[in-house]
Regions:
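A surface-exposed, charged beta-strand/loop segment in the N-terminal or early-internal portion
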Residues: 13-85
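Active-site helix-to-loop segments that bind/position phosphate- or nucleotide-bearing substrates
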Residues: 52-293
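N- or domain-start disorder-to-order transition segments that initiate the globular core
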Residues: 1-2
Length: 293
């Protein structure tokens, strides 16, 4: 594997590493993401940052103090737009039951976000749009994959297992994207900055969950590429993808990241991987120059 073409490594099984390897990876700015037995994210080897910018860090902190709600609202509105896009796809294919949620997003959701007075109210609007989205799954997914409620650690059924795994993969992709910018991973706007996680990656990945994670899941499930009896290990209180299921999901996830769409602002085709990085640069433009985010 040519090191020059490698940006990140994913360790999905037990591995042994030494300092010589870590030093080599650091010199070549390669990020390593580690996962545990339960398919959960364990952590990231994050090489010395080559893109440090003291000026941007100062401005990012100032934006947290002065513009947090503005940025958080932009993120949550982006989530709503992408959920709308996913549901409209099914509405066009005769799943008319989703119209109620589409109408709610168009008529009420954006008003609710705009009228929110603080981050807590913004997150309440975000929580509501996700819950309404989950409620539509029964209209276009097989019965085996219908969600009763969102359960994360550990996931308790196949659909929760897929969502948790997909969200984790997207989170790590976002960590890698932000690493290539001057942004500080620790200073977030929608999620509360906290110790032990890159909270800005949580912010920036949220917008893309509907169009990357959920579209990947829906396509795999509805085309029967993932099946409950063949691709999951279910225990008493948790459910996980088996090795074959993980391979199928990762392959589809990667394909989705490299698929293209017409970017609203650029008016040209870009991949979702590129769009993720572009959002990071748009945030930088807002922080430094006040350009719309």
């Amino acid at each position: 594997i040519p090191i020059e073409n490698t940006k990140e490594i994913y360790c999905m099984n037990e591995v042994t590493v030494n300092t010589k390897l870590l030093d080599f990876l650091s010199q070549n700015h390669v990020i390593v993401h580690f996962f545990n037995y339960y398919e959960g994210y364990s952590g990231t080897f994050y090489p010395k940052n080559q893109y440090n910018s003291g000026r941007l860090i100062v401005k990012q902190v100032q934006a947290y103090d002065n513009s947090r709600e503005v940025i958080a609202k932009a993120i949550v509105c982006g989530i709503g737009r992408n959920i709308y896009e996913v549901l409209y796809h099914y509405y066009k294919h005769d799943k008319k039951e989703v119209k109620e949620v589409l109408d709610w997003i168009r008529r009420e959701f954006y008003v609710k976000v705009e009228n929110a007075q603080n981050v807590k109210e913004i997150m309440a609007a975000e929580g509501e749009v996700w819950m309404r989205f989950y409620g539509t799954f029964r209209y276009f997914l097989p019965e085996d994959f219908v969600m009763n409620k969102r359960v994360k650690r550990p996931p308790d059924n196949p659909i929760n297992a897929l969502i948790s795994y997909g969200n984790t993969l997207l989170y790590t992709k976002t960590i890698s994207a932000i690493y290539q910018t001057h942004l500080d991973q620790r200073i977030s706007f929608l999620h509360e900055p906290s110790e032990g996680r890159f909270s800005l990656s949580l912010d920036m990945s949220e917008v893309f969950k509907p169009v990357i994670v959920y579209r990947t899941i829906f396509d795999l499930v509805n085309n029967r590429k993932l099946q409950v009896e063949k691709h999951f290990d279910k225990k008493v209180n948790y459910c996980l993808l088996n090795e074959e299921g993980r391979k199928i999901f990762i392959e589809a996830f990667q394909a989705r990241m490299e698929s293209v769409f017409v970017h609203d602002r650029l008016k040209r085709k870009v991949t979702y991987r590129t769009a993720l990085k572009l959002d990071c640069y748009k945030l930088i433009k807002y922080i430094l120059e006040g350009q719309e985010f």
